[in-house]
């Protein structure tokens, strides 16, 4: 009985086809990996996790985790993906926190000019401990700049600005006028809704 079931498993594996998974154009259509499936439809909506280091070869970016969702077939055995979100590693965030300073978070839902909805979590770390009014003002800066950037950008441009530090730099330049800052990061993003094609 067991030999029959094991041969059935082997036969099922033989029937599966391997598909190559590629990143979106904004990440240079880099190879993300491969996945087996009987049918291409079985592979759709699977989520892939890589680090930015995996895509760029820059070890300094190993703490940035990227998430992609398989969209469909490009040609033959090649599958396309959409950026689904990112997150900074907990160890990296922990390494940034200092005593006698403030950690300020703001979560904001935004829509890009081409209709993609995302949830963005900004993180600001001050040099010294900030007052409540200063924290409130900094949260407003995070929200306002993030919304404005999204409204002015298409999805690919906004993702690029988030991942490669343009958005966090814009927030830093404005928020430092309120209180001395040590670091600004976009801690996490998640794609909430994509426009129907």
UniProtKB/Swiss-Prot annotation:
Keyword Protein biosynthesis: no
The keyword Ribonucleoprotein is annotated on this UniProt entry: yes
Keyword terms of this UniProt record: Ribonucleoprotein, Ribosomal protein
SMART domains assigned to the protein according to its UniProt record, in alphabetical order: Ribosomal_S3Ae (SM01397)
Annotated InterPro entries: Ribosomal_eS1, Ribosomal_eS1_arc
GO cellular component entries: ribonucleoprotein complex; ribosome
GO MF entries: structural constituent of ribosome
GO BP terms in the entry: translation
Family statement: Belongs to the eukaryotic ribosomal protein eS1 family.
Name of the protein this chain belongs to: Small ribosomal subunit protein eS1
Organism: Sulfolobus acidocaldarius (strain ATCC 33909 / DSM 639 / JCM 8929 / NBRC 15157 / NCIMB 11770)
Upper classification of the organism: Archaea, Thermoproteota, Thermoprotei, Sulfolobales, Sulfolobaceae
Gene: rps3ae
